[in-house]
Amino acid sequence: MIIKEFLATEKAVKLIESQNTLTIIVNRNTTKKDIKNEVEKLFSVKVEKINTLITPKGEKKAYVKLKQEYKASDVAHKLGML
């Protein structure tokens, strides 16, 4: 599985509300294209862009910005984050 978990930290919730962005921990060898396909398939949304980074713990974190016509808060509600 590509997606390990969705983060619901204070910063992640702020990004959902202000920038329409989901914060996801993914497998380290996953590409941006794989992340995009998985998110679009699971939640029936369109992804605008993805930024990734490797945390000091060695986890890969992806910031997934959704297109304007879709709401990250709707996805977060489906997941029970908000």
Swiss-Prot record:
The Swiss-Prot or TrEMBL record annotates one GO molecular function as: structural constituent of ribosome
The entry describes its oligomerization and partners as: Part of the 50S ribosomal subunit. Contacts protein L29.
Q: What is the native source organism of this protein?
A: Sulfolobus acidocaldarius (strain ATCC 33909 / DSM 639 / JCM 8929 / NBRC 15157 / NCIMB 11770)
Q: Which gene encodes it?
A: rpl23
What does this protein's UniProt record list under function? Answer: Binds to 23S rRNA. One of the proteins that surrounds the polypeptide exit tunnel on the outside of the ribosome.
Question: Which keywords are on file for this protein?
Answer: Ribonucleoprotein, Ribosomal protein, RNA-binding, rRNA-binding
Query: Which family does the UniProt entry place this protein in?
Result: Belongs to the universal ribosomal protein uL23 family.
Q: Which Pfam families match?
A: Ribosomal_L23
Instruction: Kindly list the biological process annotations in GO that this record carries.
Output: translation
Q: Which domain of life is it from?
A: Archaea
Q: Which PANTHER family does UniProt cross-reference here? A: 60S RIBOSOMAL PROTEIN L23A (PTHR11620)
The signal sequence is: none
**A single cellular component GO annotation:** ribonucleoprotein complex
The record's annotation in InterPro entries points to: Nucleotide-bd_a/b_plait_sf, Ribosomal_uL23, Ribosomal_uL23-like, Ribosomal_uL23/eL15/eS24_sf, Ribosomal_uL23_CS
Listed Gene3D superfamilies: 3.30.70.330
Family matches, as SUPFAM superfamilies: Ribosomal proteins S24e, L23 and L15e
Keyword Ribonucleoprotein tagged: yes
Which cysteines link up through disulfide bonds?
A: none
The identity of this protein, by name, is Large ribosomal subunit protein uL23
